[in-house]
Amino acid sequence: MDTHNKGDSIIRFSVSLQQNLLDELDNRIIKNGYSSRSELVRDMIREKLVEDNWAEDNPNDESKIAVLVVIYDHHQRELNQRMIDIQHASGTHVLCTTHIHMDEHNCLETIILQGNSFEIQRLQLEIGGLRGVKFAKLTKAFSFEYDE
């Protein structure tokens, strides 16, 4: 009986590319510090899978996970409370928040979210649109099985 997980086995396959695409791939390997073309291609495939999963518009799919990074002026009146109110009113699950003081005026907050893609992206737009918010970036993820 094979005790190895199918998702753990490595399958070798070949890809045909034009020279200019191969050159670009090799440049990215060097620029980003990858040890091989395979490592870069695996990361690119994972990125595309996440992107495609988030593009699927299923309001009942609560499997999306994201991290919202927000930098804001903590002297902006009532901004903290408005950010909290938006989180509570949203259709997403706020799993965790982390708050740090960057300097005298700026705070950085990370908010880990779970829910459907529409609600998570709406929360990002609402918080990002508040007066005093200087930066609001959403990093998208989802949990998927390789061996389905």
Curated annotation (Swiss-Prot):
Gene3D superfamilies linked to this entry: ACT-like. Chain A, domain 2, Met repressor-like
Listed cofactors: Ni(2+)
Gene Ontology molecular functions: DNA binding; DNA-binding transcription factor activity; nickel cation binding
UniProt superkingdom: Bacteria
Example GO BP: response to nickel cation
Residues binding Ni(2+): H88, H99, H101, C107
Pfam families documented for this protein: NikR_C, RHH_1
Free-text comment on the cofactor: Binds 1 nickel ion per subunit.
Keywords tagged on the record: DNA-binding, Metal-binding, Nickel, Transcription, Transcription regulation
NCBIfam families the UniProt entry points to: PRK00630.1, PRK01002.1, PRK02967.1, PRK04460.1
Annotated HAMAP family: NikR (MF_00476)
The family this protein is said to belong to: Belongs to the transcriptional regulatory CopG/NikR family.
Protein purpose: Transcriptional regulator.
Name of the protein in its database record: Putative nickel-responsive regulator
